[in-house]
Amino acid sequence: LISREGFSNIYSNVYHKYPPTSIQEVGEFSEIKLITGEEKHSHKHILTSKIKSGGDCITSRVPLLFNDDLIISKAHVDNSMELPYKNGWADEVLFIHEGVGTLHSNFGNINIKSGDYLVIPRGVIWEIHVEVNMKVLAIESSTPVETPERYRNKFGQLLEHSPFSELSLIHI
């Protein structure tokens, strides 16, 4: 069962073809170092193309901005993920600025390219295999990422005046 907010909210029953019946390995814990700025708030131009990072879609992330609800990072991805990943803390939005690859998840596979947005709810097991090095903007949100209520009916379907429709979304 995958659920964002427990058994009394929206959930998916997921059946594994090869059930993960035991823990194979617990990796090292690597703390994300978030440094609070001491300067007065002002406009900034963050030159993200000059950020030096490398690794997979998780290890190459460099946090840029954060608050109590989210962390915005930039990643220069030059390696495929060796193991599947599950974020139990946050929903993730990945914007593929450059590059090509494939997202593999327990819901299926999807080819990804420059200009794509990926919304990955917390609890989903996923990994990205890189075909062409990627530049990714990653947003981790501790609250669910969903369409605004004003664009949905009571059943969650997008309304006619929504800025996009289900037809413009790729489902896996």
What positions do the PLM features span?
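An N-terminus-focused feature that recognizes amino-terminal "leader" regions
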Residues: 1-140
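Glycine- and charge-enriched low-complexity intrinsically disordered segments
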Residues: 145-168
